[in-house]
Amino acid sequence: MRVKGGTVTRARRKKWLKLAKGYWGHKSIGYKVAKQAVVKSWTYAFRDRKQVKRNFRKLWISRINAAVRPLGMSYSQFINGLKKANVKINRKMLSELAIREMKTFEMLVSISKSSK
């Protein structure tokens, strides 16, 4: 008698369809298309985990630059001055200070200006 392996096949297909739950159209119903969509989504997820770091760094830099320009400096001059003054504070914290604690940020700008 021929063994068709129905339960194993059904379980495997069910696993892929469960991963594709919430996808639009045939991507959540059809096994082959669902499997392709899930694998593609993993590719996007891998790529975007790297990109999110770049995007946040860009955001922080543009925020710092926007906060430092009215105080008479450019971003690069500000960062260079902080490095010369041996102030070790990362860009994330600098951008948060620029948004929430403007007085503290202005103090850092004055430190950066004086260290030239």
From Swiss-Prot:
Q: Per the UniProt entry, what is one GO biological process? A: translation
Keywords annotated in UniProt: Ribonucleoprotein, Ribosomal protein, RNA-binding, rRNA-binding
Listed PROSITE patterns: RIBOSOMAL_L20
What GO cellular component is one of the record's annotations? ribonucleoprotein complex
Q: Name one GO molecular function term.
A: structural constituent of ribosome
Q: Which InterPro entries does the annotation name? A: Ribosomal_bL20, RIBOSOMAL_L20_CS, Ribosomal_protein_bL20_C
The record's NCBIfam families line, in alphabetical order, gives:
rplT_bact
* Role played: Binds directly to 23S ribosomal RNA and is necessary for the in vitro assembly process of the 50S ribosomal subunit. It is not involved in the protein synthesizing functions of that subunit.
Q: Which family is annotated? A: Belongs to the bacterial ribosomal protein bL20 family.
Database matches in PANTHER family = 39S RIBOSOMAL PROTEIN L20 (PTHR10986)
What's the name of the protein? Answer: Large ribosomal subunit protein bL20
Organism of derivation? Mycoplasmopsis pulmonis (strain UAB CTIP) (Mycoplasma pulmonis)
